[in-house]
Amino acid sequence: MAIRKKSNKNPPVLSHEFVLQNHADIVSCLAMLFLLGLMFEITAKGAIIFVALQYNVTRPATEEQAAESASLYYYGIKDLATVFFYMLVAIIVHAIIQEYVLDKINRRMHFSKTKHSKFNESGQLSAFYLFACVWGTFILVSENYISDPTILWRAYPHNLMTFQMKFFYISQLAYWLHAFPELYFQKTKKEDIPRQLVYIGLYLFHIAGAYLLNLNHLGLVLLVLHYFVEFLFHISRLFYFSDEKYQKGFSLWAVLFVLGRLLTLILSVLTVGFGLARAENQKLDFSTGNFNVLAVRIAVLASICITQAFMMWKFINFQLRRWREHSAFQAPPVKRKPAVTKGRSSRKGTENGVNGTVTSNGADSPRSRKEKSS
């Protein structure tokens, strides 16, 4: 087996190119340090803060659930360490999908640089949206959210979460935080960075807001709804890159996008504007996690409405741009009329000749008449 010579291509250790090429291996080694810390008694107490969920309490069994006691969780400052560890996991998974799936497809399809970056973006996001949507739907079904919608606001504050619920939110925060270093690892263009920062910031703002304000029930429903619509868009864009005639997915996405925005507003107003507004306990209490006061409710509804309006504005601009491009592509080419020269020779040919041939009986030109008169 021949040994490949890489000495001329390998960048210097810890250089810019070295970090970009080997960032997945570097992050994997860092994550392994936390896992190895669990094996030793001295470091286990510190390592477990990063790996396992914190702040669990055991609720005693009731008469309805006499067979088992439930372990519930609340949030705290140690969750930042857990989010950091799973952010490293998200970077590793991102690199695996990129190297073993997307890069192989890119080599076969021979995309341009613009399509290459958009294909990678849609490939990564479609995989994440599908996974998160299936996971979130499983939580909704297992905790009877669909059969009893009043659980969205009943018994607020929802400061105690099941393992699946808390792990879902930790994973969401970790994934969207990992998107910041990925802008550097993936060599994102400078003109694309502001757009990326806007939607990453919006995700983190709303997910963290639902998590910290104990609106995790409402946040889960809205995330599943939003992720399903976004998954349809990115999977349609993947099919479009392979066949530019494919437009059915975008048409279905356009309808579901508008319906998704309406459902988001309806559920938000129903939960925050009516459900929580009629609750008996409307006092601000940080110890119990009760934020059901008028100012917080107005802020929550305002942030949701502004975000939905911003998304609709972007959606309308996107549809208008696609409509203009489609109209320009379908419009027939305009036939240009031949330019008519206004020189003296052309006028002489039209006035004194037939089919461009000068006749002997033609009238004299103004200059010749002037010379004769003189």
From Swiss-Prot:
Residues 333-374 are annotated as: Disordered. GO terms for biological process: cotranslational protein targeting to membrane; protein insertion into ER membrane; response to unfolded protein; SRP-dependent cotranslational protein targeting to membrane, translocation. It is a multi-pass membrane protein. It is found in: Endoplasmic reticulum membrane. One of its GO terms (cellular component) is endoplasmic reticulum. It holds the Pfam family TRAM_LAG1_CLN8. Residues 334-347 have a biased composition (Basic residues). Residues 54-81, 143-159, 214, 273-297 are lumenal. Residues 117-326 form the TLC domain. The chain crosses the membrane at residues 33-53, 82-102, 122-142, 160-180, 193-213, 215-235, 252-272, 298-318. The lineage of its organism: Eukaryota, Metazoa, Chordata, Craniata, Vertebrata. Interacts with SEC61B. May interact with Derlin-1/DERL1. This is Translocating chain-associated membrane protein 1. Residues 352-363 have a biased composition (Polar residues). Keywords: Endoplasmic reticulum, Glycoprotein, Membrane, Phosphoprotein, Protein transport, Translocation, Transmembrane, Transmembrane helix, Transport.
